[in-house]
Amino acid sequence: MKRLITTAGLVLSFACQLFASDRTALARVTVYWPGEGSGKSAAWNGARLREDHCAVDPKKIPYGSKVIFGDAECMAVDTGPDVVKRKAARSLGRTPAERNAIVIDRFFHKKQTALAWESTHPHFMMVRIRATAEATN
């Protein structure tokens, strides 16, 4: 019985690693809100945007991945040309690492909330990206 429980525990611990992979990355985090020209109410694919959504480059962060900031967790569901081109990182970055950083655009329902969050957080920060098996398929 002990052997069965030990084997089951080991199998489950390895299975969890197969379904989720964590990595950290330096990111230039920007904000957007409805009516800013993009994200009026839906993401590029028609999905309704929520506060816990963000825009990413899908070649670097698969859709459905969790992006974990110091104080929040967002799901990658949207994209945009400035995110893919990394315009914010290239224009604001002072070091080569900052200029090569990925760009993540956090969605907020209100402009005031977005600007308040942006003003209290650094422009560049380390984020944790958790890509699940569903996100990588």
Predicted features along the sequence, with ranges:
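Bacterial N-terminal signal peptides
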Residues: 7-15
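Solvent-exposed, well-ordered loop and adjacent helix/strand elements within mature globular domains
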Residues: 19-137
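Positively charged n-region of N-terminal signal peptides that target proteins for export
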Residues: 1-4
